[in-house]
Amino acid sequence: MLIPRQPVPDLCVPTLAHGDFTISADAAQNFTLVVFYRGLHCPICLRYLLELSRLLPEFEQRGVKVVAVSSDTAERAQAMADKLRAPGLRVGHSLPLAVAREWGLYISASRGMTSIGVQEPALFSEPGVFLVRPDGTLYYGAVQTMPFARPHFDELRDALDFALAKNYPARGEYTAAS
């Protein structure tokens, strides 16, 4: 389990148009927003990433760098990017499932063809959203076991305004409870 205020696992994945993304070498002014999505087969992911790409300039104005990452192959990630039409959004791919596990993501097995006619990969990671401080520590994290009920990016943007204005600390750091 990832703990707020503690270092996150290293994350290094190729992106489609922005070179390799390595979280430890890509510190933002305030935060890096890492959005793990299921992949091309997920219509909810497409809508979610469209919302993210719409708000990308607002995150950037707040000193937040953004990357969307899946365990999809480069070809499948490119097909998703083609649907998104958001050239400013860094789209990472080929996330090793072992690294997904280190981030606390759930892994699902294929159920075959989806409702949109796209084959699910044999195994893939489920969604997660993380805010990482420039020092590589976790500020915020949310993981889902399925594509539903994810954090809304407009609410996250508004929460960032509060957190930055008030220098609000990461919460959930206490680990001594039994």
Residue ranges and their predicted role:
Residues 1-178:
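Chalcogenol-based redox active-site neighborhoods
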